[in-house]
Structures are given as C-alpha cells and as structure tokens.
Amino acid sequence: MTEPQVLPDGARVVVAGLGVTGRAVVAALSGRAASVVTVDGRADDADVRDGDDPAVAQRVVAGADLVVASPGWAPSTPLLTAARAAGVPVWSEIELAWRLRVARAGARGPAPWLAVTGTNGKTTTVEMLASILTAAGLRAAAVGNVGTPVVEAAQDPSLDVLAVELSSFQLHHTLTTSFEAAAVLNVAADHLDWHGSLDAYVADKGRIYARAQVACVYNVADPRTEQLVRDADVTEGALAVGFTLGAPGPGQLGVVEDVLVDRAFHAEPGARDRQRTAAELGTLADLAHLAPGAVAGTGGTPVVPPHVVANALAAAALARAHGVPASAVRDGLRAFRPGAHRIARVRELDGVAWVDDSKATNAHAAAASLAAYAPGTVVWVAGGLAKGASFDALVADRADRLRAAVVIGVDQEPIRGALARHAPEIPVVAVDPGDTGSVMRRAVAAARDLARPGDTVLLAPAGASMDQFASYAQRGEAFATAVAEL
C-alpha cells in the first residue's frame, strides 16, 4: 500500500479549533509546517477569533495549503465551507495523525491501530480493549475521543498498538487510514444537527472500515453495521467478524450459556475443525463487576447488562484480530474498571441506590442504561441538549422500568412529551433550568422525594451536557456532589 504524503513541502496550515485536539495538532505541526494559523472564537490566544464571519473565513483560507479541523467544527461552518470552495483540503486530526505516525522502537513500522466507533459504548469498548492488550503483555494505550489526542500517541515510539476511539465527527474528514481492525458497535440517530441527516451520519461511521487490513467487526443485532462492512472497500483478505449475544455462527463471537466464545479467530484458515470448534474467552462472571447492583440469575449466573456483554465481545474481537491469546482476553476483562460517569454507583442511602451514568448522552445509551434495572424501580433523571432527537422509542421501550422521572436541561419538551404519551401514569418533575448553578441539587432533591427503598435514582440524561454544564463529566460530578450532600 502506498503511504500518503505527510504534508506538502512548505505547507501553510490553518488549524480550526484550539481545544485539546487543536493544541495537540499545533504542537505536532511545529517544525513541520511553514506557518500555522489558528482559528477559534473562544480562545484568547487564537490568531483569528472571528472565523465565523464568511468574509474573514475566505481571507484565512485564501493562502492556505491545508485546514486541520477539530471535531466540533461542523462541515457547514463558514471556515470549512470557504476551504471547500477554494479547493483547500480539510483533514481531521486523525488524518494528520495517520500521516505523522512514527516507527515503533525496535520495529520496522508504526504501531497498528485498532479502531472503534458507534453511537454508544465506544469509550468503554476501547478501554476494555486496552486492558486486554495490556494483559497480553503489549504496550497499549486507549486514545482518541476517549481522551489523549491520537496525534500525540501516533508519535510515541514506545507503544506496540493503539486502541483508538473515533467519533463520527473525527471520521468525517478522515481520508486515508488503514486500520488493522475496526468495529462499529451500533448505529442510532445522533448528532443529526451536525451531519445534516441520518444517512450522512451513518456514512461517516462507515469510514472506519475503509482499507481495513485484518477484520471488520460488526454487531449482528444491528443490520446497519453489517451493511457498512458489505459496502466497505477493504484490504484483500480482511474478515467480516460479527458479535452476538446469542450462540455464534462461524466467523462470529458470542455467548454459549455463560461462556464468551470465539468462532472467528480460534483456528488457522482452512483448519479441518474450524466450523465445529470455538475458543473460550471467559465467562459472564468475569464481567459481573461491571454491572453495579447486578443480581444472580438462574443457577447463579450473574445478570450482566446486554450492552456490557456486547462491548466486551467487540473488544475481544479486535484483540483477537491482533493475535491476542484467549487467556489474555479473560484476564483483561477481569482487570478492566470503567471510567467515571458510566453506570457508577455514587451512594446508597435509606435503601436507595444513586447511579451516575452521565455518559449516556443520547436516547440509545439511556435505553441501554435503563435496561439493567428491574421494572418499576428507577427514578430517572434525564434531559439536556436533545440535538434534534426523538425520545418516543426510548420511553415506549423502557416505560416499564420507571417509577418516576425528573427532567432537567433546556430541551425539556421532547422528553416530557414522550413521557406524557408513553408513560402517562408515572409522576414527572420538571426542574426549572433558569438557575444553572443549582439545577442538579434541585433535581436530586426531587428524586429523593420520589424514590422508595429498593429503587435506583439513575442519571442517564439521553442528552448532551453543554446546555448547563461544560461536559458530561462536570454534569456527573454535580450529581455526585448533590447526592453526597443529602
């Protein structure tokens, strides 16, 4: 495969955005680009702060050879619109990182990338994958949308392999990557305000499979993900590998009774027993610690939420594509601990559990979170920026889990309307969004009054946080602080 040119000689580069990603891009371009112009209306040290003015945007790109766009910059922004009109290439940070990769210490080439995208579960899956790779004795890091900019990690020669979380924003301007293996976990309507349509959103997710070398991992329960694999132009010999919560067929990973099994990578191609055998990767008991409040089911089998099992299978598939042994998959899953604000139990008080799942920033994620609890036992704290989404399917499918709901955020009407239509019998408290500083304390107080012993108060907002909080993390911290003050 011909490697793409790193940067044009004497390149004049415009960097759109000076957040964490943009600053990492600027650092990476130091000494490589002839000039760098930064554009960000919210950064005091940006070279250009009025890039949203179309006339200014045209002047900025007029002399540029390249624009590197941070994930938050939608294609419709004046700067990127002007770049396209002027014929100036636009790259994502991921595209730049791919072109700047350095060789591993003691190896011939750069570290391979194992990449994950999806509407939900990306961060958990990538962190699970990094845990598995580490258990196999590899120097691995979870990078990308999960935290550390990829452009930094790609230049670290000490890493053996990168576990890369990619959002649809990051994939939109990614053009030449060729991941060792890639996974799309699921696809549900999200970020339609950014992409313009569901079809455009799905297409950007599918970019992750382009030129995949070893495996394209898809969700058997989500036909869109399999179709993206079918449509992808991959490296010859790359496998299509499905994961399923049921018994796997050949070429799949799945669950038999309480055992996680691999029927995709367990034998050499052409092996005589390939169709009839499977490798054991662990059991559901190895995942029980990832479900706060999980109870034992029939025969003592731990009840692990389906989305947790699905994430583990996807991570296992990517690790197996890299050649990791089955024992390391088991050890990595046992050792894995999720990050903050992901189904994290913050307190139990008077028989009521308080759980922070602030990372559930859309309806699909909130549905998965609610599914983990018994019927009629959840006081649901929900709301935020709706991003143009509908909540009817979420409420209709999970109404049986709810005892009550507390609605926060500026986009309350979509959730309140869905609750009125599909769960009219449950009490709903709407928290006035006017006083942002006290919104979570008031929400927690309302939830306390609604909950009964044995219930769970679950913060699973189904919306983005930026209406009243700086991030989902700050929203979760505000929840935990308010609960601690009860």
Placement of each model-derived feature along the sequence:
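Extended acidic/charged loop-beta regions that coordinate divalent cations
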Residues: 40, 54-60, 107, 159-193, ...
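C-terminal helical cap/extension that packs against the catalytic core
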Residues: 46, 392-455
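Beta-strand->loop->alpha-helix junctions that form or flank phosphate-binding loops
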Residues: 40, 91-96, 141-144, 233-255, ...
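Nucleotide phosphate-binding/pyrophosphate-handling subdomain across enzymes
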Residues: 3-13, 24-28, 292-403
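N-terminal leader/targeting and accessory segments in enzymes
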Residues: 1-100
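Phosphate-binding loop of NTP-binding sites
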Residues: 30, 58-62, 71-239, 480-486
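Residue-level signal for inorganic ion chemistry
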Residues: 29, 67, 116, 145, ...
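Short internal beta-strands
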Residues: 37-40, 217-220, 379-382, 401-411
